[in-house]
């Protein structure tokens, strides 16, 4: 990876971390540690590796991301907002009444396809 790309990813990761802290602080609820710990991974995946299109989130040939760590919703939401899937201002509605940014991600509301299963659930 060239230095310019690496610097760009570092800047995006820094912005995502800032949003994670702001989401959790604004909601007065959440798990910042888990979200902060996966920021670099999400940044590289969404901004350098995965084939996704914020303008066409249901694109049949898109790559899929499986989130098995539901408490990292703030990191996923911040990454998706920075990528352009929804307005960054929506991050400040995290865990608020009537917000689509719930404490655990839900395919019903966030404009991408992913799944969060508990141990007792089946796909």
Give short role names for the model-derived ranges.
Residues 71-73, 83, 100-101:
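A short acidic, glycine/proline-enriched capping/turn motif at secondary-structure boundaries
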Residues 2:
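Conserved, charged catalytic cores of large soluble enzymes
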Residues 85-93:
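A glycine-rich helix N-cap at a beta->alpha junction
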Residues 77-86:
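Alpha-helical support elements that line or immediately flank enzyme active sites
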Residues 44-48, 82-83, 122:
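Active-site catalytic microenvironments for nucleophilic, acid-base chemistry
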Residues 6-71:
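N-terminal amphipathic, basic-rich helices that act as targeting or association modules
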Residues 94-113:
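An acidic/histidine-cluster motif and surrounding catalytic segment
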Residues 116-123:
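Single conserved hydrophobic/aromatic residue that forms the stacking wall/gate
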